[in-house]
Amino acid sequence: MAKAANIIKVEQIGSAIRRHHSQRATLVGLKLNKIGRVTELQDTPEVRGMIAKVQHLVRVVDEK
């Protein structure tokens, strides 16, 4: 039986306006597009790297 994946909730706290296109693309990859939106993602090294890239625009709300 497969092990359940860890889930991480990420909230966008900063605007993508006047940000580099790669940071905007990272927000899209995290399924975020407006301030205050929260998404649930699998806790993987790739997602952690994306969060680190836009750490000034997002906040980790909950880790399960």
UniProtKB/Swiss-Prot annotation:
Family, as annotated: Belongs to the universal ribosomal protein uL30 family.
Record's protein name: Large ribosomal subunit protein uL30
Superkingdom classification of source: Bacteria
Alphabetical keyword list: Ribonucleoprotein, Ribosomal protein
Pfam families named among the record's database cross-references: Ribosomal_L30 (PF00327)
GO biological process: translation
Record has Transmembrane as a keyword: no
HAMAP family with a match to the protein in the record: Ribosomal_uL30_B (MF_01371_B)
GO CC terms in record: cytosolic large ribosomal subunit
Subunit structure: Part of the 50S ribosomal subunit.
UniProt key word Glycosyltransferase: no
GO molecular function, one term: structural constituent of ribosome
